[in-house]
Amino acid sequence: MSTHRPRIAVVGAAAAGLAAAEGLRRLGWDGEIALIGDEPHLPYDRPPLSKQILSGAWEPERTALRDTEQIAALGLDLRLGTRALAYDPARRVLTLGDDGHTELRCVGVIAATGVTPRSLPGTDGVEGVHVLRTLEDACALRRRLATPGRRLAVVGTGVLGAEAAAVARALGHEVTLVGTGDTVMERVLGAEVGGLLADVHRAQGVTLRTGQAVTGVRAEAGRAVGVVLADGSTVEADDVLLAIGSDPAVGWLRGPGAGTAGPDLTDGLRCDEFCAAAPGLYGAGDIARWYHPVLRRELRIEHRMNASEQGLAAARNLLAELDPERFGERRPFTPVPYFWSDQYDLKLQAHGVLTGADRIEVRTLGKDPLRLAALYGGDGLATGVLAIGLPPRRTRGLRALIATPVPWPEAVARLADAVDA
């Protein structure tokens, strides 16, 4: 008789994967848990990479989410520095890229492999060209910024690019922020609030080249010396940070065995409201595109809080699928999404969904344009709210505005009451 315990594999050893593994144990799973990550590190926190690590305020080890004793207490089959190559959903067999291409037979898999940063053609191996996704990425750019007086070109005006530009400028470097939008973080914040944030960067000494596409990196002797813009001009730089978005890390789910009946991998791993992509296969974190039944739309959210919350939800629902008598019924994953960004002395906090809004209402607190609340909506409903420079009490109160869908006129009236209270 076989003595093997049933195994659940969690593929991805960052915040979502850790939350899933911890959730499985906390909820009572006594079978094996394989936690597989392609980086050599124990699970660590990514948001500090573009802030405290890049600035030098933290040493790398401070990003660890758990220490070795806490990880050991989970009783995991921990496989770090190991890449998943393929998953066969019919056989429930996971293939790993270590020596011999190990196959793991699983009763369930939680996919939490996150995203991979985009690059530009012809930049592989060019000294001074950076992306910012891993601890090694952050430490490499940090070492470059330890030399005073460098010129940094940041390509991409989203959250990552804006945060990195703020850190580099605070360190005293010459920073140029280049993007195709007209403002900073425009896709998320909209033109009005994005314009205010762009003014903050300019006031801090950042040069903005907005409405500009980058066609390539100019290199001499294998080293970056600038970026070339679509208008033919060049931004001279000693270092170039590419913050031009990312792609869901779903390649291993396309591997042998997935076949034509495999999961939908368009813009991530498509999941239902329970985070399930197929029987026994669940998604969590940046990789997961799931249906939010309260908001009645599909979402894929690349934010830290969502990663942890969805990791736990995926664990709970996988267990409920495997043994409903023991673990109960599955529950829809219906969070109120949250993210924050620190730039200079500003803290931006957002609840709900801001992207894709067709209307935005901005209310300032007093005469300071950088103490504000902004309401975001679509299809006649309020969907998200942003706070900049507001006290915690007011920020917490704003979340209630969009926790459930509210008609736009009612939400606008409540926004005024919340800000003026």
Identify the role of each PLM range:
Residues 140-189, 193:
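Rossmann-like NAD(P)H-binding beta-loop-alpha module
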Residues 2-76, 165-188:
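Beta1-alpha1 glycine-rich phosphate/pyrophosphate-binding loop at the start
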Residues 1-9, 65-153, 228-230, 239-243, ...:
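FAD-binding core/adjacent interface of flavoenzyme oxidoreductases
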Residues 7, 225, 233-265, 344-421:
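C-terminal catalytic lobe of FAD-dependent flavoproteins
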Residues 4-6, 289-392:
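Mid-to-C-terminal Rossmann-like scaffold of FAD/NAD(P)H-dependent oxidoreductases
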Residues 127-148, 223, 233-313:
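FAD-site-proximal beta/loop scaffold in flavoenzymes
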Residues 12-16, 38, 133-134, 155-160:
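Glycine-rich Rossmann-fold phosphate-binding loop(s) that bind the pyrophosphate
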Residues 30-32, 78-98, 104, 171-273:
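A Rossmann-like FAD-binding core segment of flavoenzymes
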